[in-house]
């Protein structure tokens, strides 16, 4: 696990949101989740899922694409280009193995003490909320 990833206790994604001690934990609409590199199949699916259950979702990608247009139409805030400003005010930042440590969004999320999760960690959390797993 990279040095910059905060290890947190997460019983469920919907019970105590990401283990956060905040007044936001009772209202998903006030919890801001950002995906660095949201254009891929897995990251966009996780973004759609969190949006569908009521979270505030945003994501960034280095270049525009059809999948990003669809995400935007569904209600995900999309940023083209990856900039530190994109993660300001975000409570949780999700990234995949394709994202390098020097990524400006990832670096700022760590500086801001946002909860930083790998895509695989979020996928595990989400899957724990279903009785049948594939």
Regions found by a protein language model. Give the residues of each.
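N-terminal, intrinsically disordered, basic low-complexity segments enriched in Arg/Pro/Ser/Thr
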Residues: 1-3, 17
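Polybasic, lysine-rich low-complexity intrinsically disordered segments
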Residues: 3-8, 25
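N-terminal leader/targeting and accessory segments in enzymes
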Residues: 14-122
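Walker A (P-loop) phosphate-binding motif
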Residues: 35, 124-134
């Amino acid at each position: 696990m990279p040095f910059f990833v905060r290890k947190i206790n997460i019983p469920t994604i919907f019970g105590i949101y990401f283990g956060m001690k905040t007044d936001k934990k009772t209202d998903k609409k006030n919890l801001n989740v950002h995906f660095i590199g949201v254009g891929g199949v897995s990251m966009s699916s996780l973004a759609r899922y969190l949006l569908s259950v009521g979270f505030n979702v945003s994501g960034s990608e280095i270049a525009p694409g059809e999948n990003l247009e669809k995400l935007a139409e569904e209600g995900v805030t999309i940023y083209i280009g990856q900039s530190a400003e994109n993660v300001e005010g975000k409570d949780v930042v999700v990234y995949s193995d394709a994202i390098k440590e020097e990524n400006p969004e990832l670096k700022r999320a760590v500086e801001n003490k946002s909860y930083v999760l790998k895509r695989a960690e979020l996928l595990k959390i989400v899957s724990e909320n279903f009785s049948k797993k594939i």
